[in-house]
Structure formats: structure tokens, C-alpha cells
Amino acid sequence: MSSTESPVPAAAAPAEAVPASTPAPAAEQPAVGNGEQRNNADAANNTSLYVGELDPSVTEAMLFEIFSMIGTVASIRVCRDAVTRRSLGYAYVNFLNAADGERAMEQLNYSLIRNRPCRIMWSQRDPALRRTGQGNIFIKNLDAGIDNKALHDTFAAFGNILSCKVATNETGSLGYGFVHYETAEAAEAAIKHVNGMLLNDKKVYVGHHIPRKERQAKIEETRANFTNVYAKNVDPEVTDDEFEKLFTKFGKITSCVLQRDEDGKSKGFGFVNFEDHNEAQKAVDELHDSDFKGQKLFVARAQKKSEREEELRRSYEAAKNEKLAKFQGVNLYLKNIPESYDDERLREEFAPFGAITSCKIMRAPSGVSRGFGFVCYSAPEEANKAVSEMNGKMLDNRPLYVALAQRKDVRRQQLEAQIMQRNQLRLQQQAAAQGMGYPGPGMYYPQPGAFPGQPGGMVPRPRYAPAGMMPQGMPMAPYGQPGQFPAGMMPQGYRPARPPRGAPNAAGGPAPPAGARPPTGVNGAPRPAGQPVPGQPMPRGPAARPAGRPEADQPGALTAAALAKASPEEQKQMLGEAIYPKVAASQPELAGKLTGMILELPVTELLHLLEESEALDAKVNEALEVLKEYQQNDSAGAEAEANAEAPKTEA
């Protein structure tokens, strides 16, 4: 982690008092809950931290590396979009004790993660407490150089801060921010002492935060009772007196101005402010679209620039969405088009599937084909038929690619989601290789010695757990994938078992390593003589299996009826115990990974693989090829990730 950079606090210098004014409408809600202290009511129980302002590329593994330097981390979860799996920019870090959380906020708050300062706060699960306006203040006219850290340091002198945020966009600070204090008294003190002061040579306004709903209601009320009128398309030869006389007949005017340039020439627009709203409304109704000295006037309520831009943005988005909806499912994207093809020849190829509304091959400025284009049909059914018939068709000995057209941002999100999934898989494989707890999907560790025989129709009862895995039925803490523990961390009260190497111990299997500790009982006591040891071969002969036990109850001879009585997790465990020995017979070194990949198949197909050895062998070979191909393609990325410099923090 990069070293923590603490911006110098904005210097507060007294300035002459400024009249209290209504705060400008804020585009963002204030951040809440970010700070150094918690409410006393939560002090004893809360160990969960909210970490915000994260770069989308930040993963659970990166956060664990950072926060584990402070104390024992129970779990980490980066919140992601349910569809694209793209990071939402915030995460939750759970410590085992509150003291570690306190230290994490003191030492890591506003520190840089991927060159972006993070914001850390205690997780507040009660939305009523998160949205309360008590102790929340609004600051505007901030200098562009003031960031979250500088704002926090400036206002920390008045009380415990629960939240501190400067509103920003892609270009930087928006010039306003929010500070949420623990008490209303601290907020009042901050308003009293800082309102009208100079921060970085700019006079700031500090007042109580007004919730968005109240601000919006006040704005709507102001718009409905407007008195300021805007007029454009005014003839350049019109004088100020003529312009004012035009509006005087509608009521008393408090101000009237016709905008002019530096040379004194009229810009063709101006503003008229009436004393009464009804008079202003009457002027708009009668003068809009009227003729004045040969020009058709445009007269309407005067708007702020930000309001006009917002209306234009909304209208643009509405037109854009309407256009996208119109072509949704009917516009096709084509690539690998032969250079000899033109628009007409391409249209002839796709005409048999329906009515084409447009067909175009994209070309360079020189007129040379760029090899891709678009075909738009009148109905989705026609487009789907064209995709199924034309995708992969050979045109001039070149396979044509045909698919539904997608927007660039949608394609980018899908690509980012795919890259993120590959990175997660690589991190899980690295974690498995380094003993960082049991990996997520794609790796399978059998129970040592498998499960002993169970009565007919009963699901297995797990007695032992592999390294980093809790027995079934216990809650799993989130870390990347559900149930995965970071960096070998184990829940308190569980002892990790040694993961199996190669195939499960059986007759002729690998012997325990030199210096291995002797077998122990469940509670660590020496195992009584004669008691079977998990993972060791059972005695041969009639005593190896209880008398009268049906063969179908043995692992490897599972039935659909037995699996139907088990939960999905138990079904996978039962099938894994049956499949693993068969995979290990041919691939002892990769049995765990290959079994994990095979277990992703549906249960019905897994039962078929247990019955048909040839089908299982074919599936093992297929999984082996996929694994080798992935390892070859991903080796460069794994090496870069391993060599990445670890960021450092300082208090």
C-alpha cells in the first residue's frame, strides 16, 4: 500500500461576517458514518467497518493485506453489482474485536489504496440512524484544494465527527461538502465559529444540512412562484428603454437589463424581474412567441445554468433511451466481412430473413472497408433468425461473425466482469497453493479417509474438516466467495486439519510424513488402542463392513433417492467423496482441482458419471485440458500480481 498522504488542513482565518443565506441545492447526499469515533451505544458490539471511495479494481485480497496489519480480520466483502459483478466502490471489513477497528480507523482512514484515499467508518445497519439530520452541517464555497482529510482536520476541533465528505465528480471537487457530528451541540459550535471564515483564502458558508426532499420541495415552490423572466431573440437595435417599456404594461418591474457585449452591442437577450409572480406569469403567457420588431420572442421563466444543463441532459438521455429501445433486439453487429463486399451485396445476404431497415459497412476515410458493419431488421424474430443462420457462415472463405449489437459501455462492463472473475479465480488458486484457507469453487478437498458408512438414506455426518474449512452446518464468513477465510484465518474454536496429499490414504497409500504427531481423539486426547484412525485403511475381512449393509450405501454407489434427502451442499460433498478416488486413480496430483471442476456439473450428470466410467474419464480429460489452457494463458497475469509492490501505511 502506498504511504498515507495527509493533506495540510485548510487554514481557518477570520473574515467579516457574511449574512446567512440559503445553502445551494446539493447534488449529492451527505456521506454518513465515516469517522473516528462510534456512538457509545454501539461501542461494545460493533466490529464491522465500512470502507468507501474504493477503486473498482480493489479486491478482498488487497483489503485483507492492508487491514490484517492492524489486527485479526474475521471477514472481508467487496460489494458488487448483482449482474455485472463490478465493484460498487465500497466494502465491509469485520474484525474480531472492536479495538482493532478503532486502530484501523485511526491509522488507515484517508490512506491511499490504488492511489485513491479511502474513507473508513463504523458500519451503521440502522437506516434511520444513517439518515438522521441531527448534527449534520453543509459547507459550500470550498477551495478546490480541500479534500476529505483537510475538511476533517479543519472541523475536528468542534467535536467527534461521524462523517466527512467533499462532493466530487470526475473533474474534481464540486466546491461543497458535509460534516456529520456525533452531537447537535458540536454542529452548532462549528456553524458559529466557521461560517464566514476564510478557508484557503475563500469565504465559506456553513449551515445546517437540509435533506434532499426538503430542498427539492423548496426549489419547486420557488419555481412555481417565479418573478424573474428571461427573453431572447430580441432585435439588436432595441434600446434598453424600449425593452423595459415592452414589459412595463404587465406590472411593476424591480429590475430590467438587456445584456450587451464589451462594445455595447446587444446580445439579443435580457432579464426582467417583476414584483409579483402573477405579473411575471402574465408577461410570459402574452409575450412568448409574439412578434416584436420583426423578431419572434422567446419569453420564459429565468433558469440557472445548472438547471438548464440538467434539463438538457434529461432530454438527451430520454431521446437516447428511446432510440436504444427502438433498436433493442433488432440491430445486428457483423465482423470479419470480406473487403470485396459493399452495402448492397451485404443486404442481399441478409434479405431472406426479413425486412431490413438499414444496412451499412463501416469504412475508413479513404473508403476502405474496416471489416465490420451493422444490419437492422424490423422485428426481433427476424434478427434472431439471421443470427442463427448467418453466424459462422463462410463468405469468400472467411467465417462471418454475427451477434446482437451492444453499446460500448455494456461491452466494457461485461469485459470487466470477465476479467474480475478470472482474477478472483487466480487469487483463489494462489491461496490454495499457499495454504490460505480452502479455495472457492473449482477445488475439492475430500474428508480425510472419506465418511464412514451411514445407514441407508442418511446423509454423511462430517467428523473432520480439511485445512481452512469448517464442518458443514456452521456459518461461513464472506471473503471473496462465501465460506472462504483469508490467509489461513480460522474461526475461533476450530483446529485446521492437514490437507490430503495425493489420493486418500488406503492400502498402499502414502505414509504419514516423518515427525507427524500421533493420532488423537476428538478433543485432542490420545486415541484408545484399537480405535480406527481417520484416513487409514479399515481392517480387511468381514469386520470391515457391518453385516447386512447393502452395497448401495457405500460411497461411490450413491442413489438419487439418497441425494434427494440431502441439502445441495451435502449433495456435493457426498458426490465429491465418491468421485474423488476415481479421479485420483488417474490424476493423483490434480485430483482436488479436477474434482472441484467436475462438481460444478448438475447432480443428475454427476450420477451418470459415477455409473459410466468411460464418461467420467472423458470428463476428467476435458477438465484437465481446460485447466492446462487456463494455467498457460494466465501465467503472465499471476506473475504480475505476485510481483506487485505491497502498499505501506503509516499512522
From Swiss-Prot:
PANTHER family referenced in this protein's UniProt entry, alphabetically: RNA BINDING PROTEIN
Gene3D superfamilies attached to this UniProt entry: 3.30.70.330, c-terminal domain of poly(a) binding protein
Any one cellular-component term (Gene Ontology): nucleus
NCBIfam families: PABP-1234
Example of a GO biological process term: mRNA transport
GO MF annotation: an example: mRNA 3'-UTR binding
Composition skew (Low complexity), residue ranges: 1-27, 636-651
Gene name in the database record: PAB1
Recorded superkingdom: Eukaryota
Cytoplasm listed as a keyword: yes
Compartment(s) of residence: Cytoplasm, Cytoskeleton; Endosome; Cytoplasm
Domain (RRM) ranges: 47-125, 135-211, 227-304, 330-407
Pro residues bias locations: 529-540
InterPro entries linked: Nucleotide-bd_a/b_plait_sf, PABP-dom, PABP_1234, PABP_HYD_C, PABP_RRM1, RBD_domain_sf, RRM2_I_PABPs, RRM_dom
Name of this protein: Polyadenylate-binding protein 1
Pfam families the UniProt entry points to: MLLE, RRM_1
Domain PABC: start-end pairs: 555-632
